[in-house]
Design a protein with these regions (language model features):
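Extracellular/periplasmic helix-exit of transmembrane alpha-helices
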Residues: 153-166, 270-287, 300, 330-333, ...
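Membrane-interface loop-to-helix entry segments
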Residues: 3, 65, 73-86, 196, ...
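Flexible loop linkers connecting adjacent transmembrane helices
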Residues: 76-104, 126-128, 132-136, 148-187, ...
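Extracellular loop-to-transmembrane helix junctions
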Residues: 52-81, 129-167, 355-357, 409, ...
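Alpha-helical membrane segments and immediately flanking helix-loop junctions
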Residues: 97-130, 156-159, 165-180, 195, ...
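N-terminal alpha-helical transmembrane segments of multi-pass membrane transport
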Residues: 2-118, 128-133, 146, 489-516
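Transmembrane alpha-helical segments of multi-pass small-molecule transport proteins
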Residues: 60-65, 140, 190-198, 222-246, ...
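Helix-loop-helix module between adjacent transmembrane segments
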Residues: 70-71, 113, 142-169, 178-214, ...
Length: 516
């Protein structure tokens, strides 16, 4: 374990030093980036490589196949218990005396704040820009199936969590890998837990931190003009530290307010655009269904639309990655399965609602150029993407789409992006923290050490050119899914036992609403 700890410290030091040292000279910047890319490139290429004989990334296929298996294994649990999940979030069955630190709603808000982010804005724009509106259909389908993955991992997160005398808890994939495998007499659980924790820490510092700070700074620059990145980083680091220093209860108090606000802000803005362009909504849905099954006039045809939809859903809602199980494990409950029900709402809100709203706005806005004679989308010269007005992609495409309703809407979008980035950072700080304390032990000193490291990386992310560092951290996040889903296959029978027991007691009337 000591060697692992030394390795992790050395790796973090190199990650922090690379962008910082690169500020001294452009030639040194290039050398550092090239060296880091050469060292991490094989790992990144492996994670995002296509499945043999196809153009479908194997990691996306891994997530989709897992979601499909869990959907079938648990008898479409995401549809059968959807209503019950809403009742749980409302607090109808919540006993405040149960072990745990946060309510069902707070746990859901914390997990949602980690998934609802730039992927819903920039990622969907990329998916629709390449795969056309038809990608939206496959995105929704993947989101619906991903609900079963969230249900599985979050049930296990609560079942195998550690509960401490002071009322705090620690849970997540690393705990159910170790304790669950031991309970079933299976080998390898401890190894999987360590591997998952390493990937989780790397992902939290990269994709859950530096990338978010970098993109938030870009939006601030768009609004104000030139603005020093390090100042943005210091401001964000100070605000984030003020929130995370209080632990998961502090994070939950913030996310339970900011998540509904930013969700209403973004969805409300999208609804305004849809109302203004109401006469095009029917046409937009027609484009979605036609594009999903014909794929005509889009890059890659039908397969291209399917790949982009599945990829965006997987990258956006993180179903199967295991991160959400860390947040949900802090819930106050004596029934692990109840938090599994609550968690299945995440992919629905993130992908089926918010991502779909983004796709609809882009589709009806007229930003995707069509041939007036055929009505088909016009591809670029390389045939790799749909031509857009002014050549916009990513956040710029979504911003331009919103601006078709009101010219000042891009400012609303910029605020939404900044809020999404902030909420993602505070949630991923908790994920990384729990992985850190799993490896280095529980304690205030260990927790403070990670929180300081996390905030330092915020400044680096806002001020530096990230390049290969972000590619590596993104790969680390999806490497979490490889480890996590492997464990879920071995432990899903435990979840089915919990589901069978709870369903039986519900039918007998033994599961009653809480009356204080």
């Amino acid at each position: 374990m000591l060697n692992i700890r030394l390795f992790i410290f050395a790796l973090f030091a190199s990650l922090a030093a690379a962008p910082a040292v690169a500020q001294e000279a452009q030639t040194l910047d290039e050398k550092v980036n090239a060296a880091f890319a050469a060292a991490t490139g094989p790992f990144v290429n492996f994670i995002f490589a296509p499945f043999p004989g196809t153009i479908f990334p194997w990691i996306v296929m891994w997530l989709v196949v897992g979601a499909t298996i869990f959907t079938l294994y648990f008898g479409f649990v995401q549809f059968k218990f959807f209503g019950h999940a809403i009742a749980l979030v409302k607090g109808d069955y919540s006993d405040p005396n149960d072990a745990g630190e946060v309510s069902h709603f707070q746990a859901l808000a914390t997990a949602l704040s980690g998934t609802v982010g730039l992927g819903n804005i920039a990622g969907v724009a990329v998916a629709v820009g390449i795969g056309g509106p038809g990608a939206t259909f496959w995105m929704i389908l993947a989101g619906l199936m991903g609900m079963a993955s969230k249900f599985t991992e979050c049930t296990l997160g609560v079942k195998y969590r550690n509960e401490y005398p002071d009322g705090t808890v620690s849970g997540g994939p690393m705990y159910y890998m170790k304790k669950g495998f031991e309970e079933l007499g299976l080998p390898g659980g401890k190894f999987l837990a360590i591997l998952f924790s390493i990937f989780c820490i790397l992902g939290s510092l990269g994709g859950g931190n530096m990338f978010q700070a970098n993109q938030a700074h870009a939006q601030i620059v768009n609004i104000t003009g030139e603005f020093p990145g390090w100042i943005t980083g210091v401001i964000f680091a100070g605000i984030v530290f003020a929130v995370i220093v209080g632990g998961v209860k502090s994070i939950a108090r913030v996310t339970e307010k900011i998540v509904p606000f930013m969700g209403i802000l973004y969805v409300g803005a999208a609804l305004v655009v849809l109302i203004v362009e109401y006469d095009k909504i029917g046409w937009a849905f027609g484009q979605i269904f036609e594009g999903a099954f014909s794929g005509l006039g889009v890059a890659g045809g039908l397969v291209g639309a399917l790949i982009q939809g599945f990829k965006r859903a997987a990258f956006s809602n993180e179903a199967g990655v295991g991160s959400a199980a860390i947040a949900h494990s802090a819930v106050r409950t004596k029934e692990p399965i109840t938090e599994g029900f609550v968690s299945l709402l995440e992919p629905f809100i993130d992908t089926v609602v918010i991502c779909t709203m983004t796709a609809l706005v882009i589709t009806i806005s007229g930003q995707l150029i069509t041939d007036p004679e055929t009505g088909r989308f016009v591809l670029n010269e390389a045939g790799t993407a749909i031509t857009t007005i002014d050549g916009n992609t990513g956040v710029a495409l979504t911003s331009a789409a919103f601006a078709t309703a009101f010219s000042w809407f891009p400012y609303v979008l910029a605020v939404a992006v900044i809020l999404f980035a902030f909420s993602t950072m505070i949630s991923w700080s908790y994920y990384g923290l729990k992985a850190w304390t799993y490896l280095f032990g529980e304690g205030k000193a260990q927790e403070l050490t990670f929180k300081i490291i996390f905030c330092v990386f915020i400044v680096i992310g806002a001020a530096a050119s990230l390049g290969p560092v972000i590619d590596f951290s993104d790969a680390a996040i999806f490497a979490m899914a490889v480890v996590n889903i492997t464990a879920l296959y071995f432990l899903m029978r435990v979840v089915r036992g919990e589901l069978t027991s709870y369903s039986s007691r519900m039918k007998k009337g033994e599961i009653r609403k809480y009356v204080g």
